[in-house]
């Protein structure tokens, strides 16, 4: 069957081929317009923007404008940047405009491709969001590609960390806005915590182009963006529990590296209970009694911190802080924190100051944020391996765009060694040989620890090299830019999201920026530019003669996509190149995913010390292992999305209601309806339908009415009246409360009353929504255990989350009614104050436990840096610079004492 399928594909072409062929017909139409565009003056070319907008206003659709609009952008790029869109780039632009994903190999000019679809869609006036993975790329692309848009009369904005509301609002008001996924998501959440429409910064979600779309929509799909605020300090408890873990043995817990879980055994539970009692942490009962449930939570986090999380792989300790390492990019994620107490457990383990836990105030996943856009598209070098996920979850098709020139890179079969030592020896020998003949080498590692191990080995061999990983990311763009220089050896943790091309001979733009900075004399500038260009061209020829860039992988990642990204760094724009992975049976993927058969086979082959096995069968076996992991991760993400959709429906309902309330000049009808519903609920609870009068709880009703409506009525005598029923009681309460509120309105005036009602309604809604989020978090963790009772956790979650939502609405009605009824008004109009925004955090959800584990503190906050912000130095002699110091942390003055026994003494 497979051979028949392959034959049919050769005969008729694949689905991808057929769709690309259809686009090629439109490319010819665009090319036919090029002479006309060349003939236009700059002003006439710029005038096309107004012409297109007028045609749209007259009823034209974007597809009708596409050929001419793309031709205009191509000509503008030639005049402003000196770059002309290739035909394949025009195809990429059409794929984006159709709301799909364009897979384009490294070096094919994805950044330039985005300008085509961005310009066309910006003509509608709804705004276009171009999404990048970091601030550096957002600013670079806004400055660089912005030249095209500004040439054509469009405004370009960029949303960066640290901007205030006014700057953000201006950026979003532009025709095209550049920014990171975090910034867009946080701005959406913050907008939904505002109290006035004029304070909001975003203006809708029309069209988004997501660069590195696989990184953002797949790798970070389980990373909710969460706005949170600090809770109470529990440093002592974290430290006390941390001291328990070293006292338990391997027999006391079960560790599953594949599933990334660790649990106490029955013997381990007994051992921990004994230690906790001896230390006075747990006074009575057993570990799983309800009064000890918080201790279980702390023990589990401490166990995970010690047994699952490795220093220099999962995190590093830097300037007294535990900093998370992104497993996909190898970058430090400064400010990000694991949630639910895990980060505090790591801080206790490493004996650094323990920061307080945080409470969720608002959250959204990238999956649900980006699905809000009317049209979504993306670009990446590697998406086909995840095509089914893009289709199932986002409704996006992935199209592979042909390369401008055929790929000349040779991807060699993996070399598999018995031990890590043998693998490194072979790798070092290969690197030495390449460096000696001038071939540039890029070595990809999966962790900081491994990159530094390799660096030490190269130092011993006196091989010059540079290291690119999370510790030195400030210099990464310049290091990558020079990775194609002949003889250069560059070691890098996973290359995802680097965003800078590796050009053979070196990066011309970066060298010119560095070496011509400050030169004002035009003749000197021209001379220096020519000198740099000649030097780079000579070095490029040497690198080409040596075989082009050689990419070496030190082990396979569990995602084929990450491996493909590393390979794709070589062979850009038809350049020659090579790639090879060096593996050992001690590698994580090989060790965890069943290499017993492979080990047995290597032994039977009688491999000698330092020998490797190279065979296509090895590559296929590893690919199958990777496919299994990818399929499992996809299932996990789909399952998590089902749970998050429940919260997303509720979030959308609350946020939409908030917007309606802010838009409304008068919310009195809403408040009146709430008050009447509260009265209905009170009467139903105390005067049951079809019950006799002597069964009515009139004393209870009187008490409730006094508490919620601030009315002292002779309710207890009503039951004695002849023929009275619950309907009449309800009507009497309606009338009495209406008169009560009317008198308040008369006292302060209708305008002030309307302001008070809106302020109370919005602030009470926010408070209850925060509490509701916390309850949903607890519910999400609790329902996971119900599978053991043969009950579907998702159905349980849906049912109970709905009940919680109904409870939220009931409490909201009751509290709004009570606050307005009992309030004593002054005659001065109250101001609806914008609340100071808490620190921003992006939590990472453990795909196996469903717990949110990562918090992104200080990401995209509008506030000035806190005094204890990583970017603000603390002066030991100036307590004003210390910020909020936990009482059990070392005192910042340097005395060596705890803060509570030094400057923090009460």
Swiss-Prot record:
Catalytic activity: ATP + H2O + cellular proteinSide 1 = ADP + phosphate + cellular proteinSide 2
Keywords: ATP-binding, Cell inner membrane, Cell membrane, Cytoplasm, Membrane, Metal-binding, Nucleotide-binding, Protein transport, Translocase, Translocation, Transport, Zinc
Gene Ontology cellular component annotations, sorted alphabetically: cell envelope Sec protein transport complex; cytosol; plasma membrane
Chief place where the protein resides: membrane
Cofactor(s) needed for function: Zn(2+)
Pfam families xrefs: P-loop_SecA (PF21090), SEC-C (PF02810), SecA_DEAD (PF07517), SecA_PP_bind (PF01043), SecA_SW (PF07516)
This protein's record includes keyword ATP-binding: yes
Membrane-topology annotation of the record: Peripheral membrane protein
Top-rank lineage group of the source organism: Bacteria
Gene Ontology MF: a single term: protein-exporting ATPase activity
Residues reported in the UniProt entry to bind Zn(2+): 891, 893, 902-903
Binding site residues for ATP: 89, 107-111, 501
Matches recorded under InterPro entries: Helicase_ATP-bd (IPR014001), Helicase_C-like (IPR001650), P-loop_NTPase (IPR027417), SEC_C_motif (IPR004027), SecA (IPR000185), SecA_CS (IPR020937), SecA_DEAD (IPR011115), SecA_motor_DEAD (IPR014018)
Tagged with keyword Coiled coil: no
EC class of the enzyme, as a word: translocase
EC number(s) from the headed UniProt entry: 7.4.2.8
Family assignment from sequence similarity: Belongs to the SecA family.
Record-given protein name: Protein translocase subunit SecA
Native organism taxonomy: Bacteria, Pseudomonadati, Pseudomonadota, Alphaproteobacteria, Hyphomicrobiales
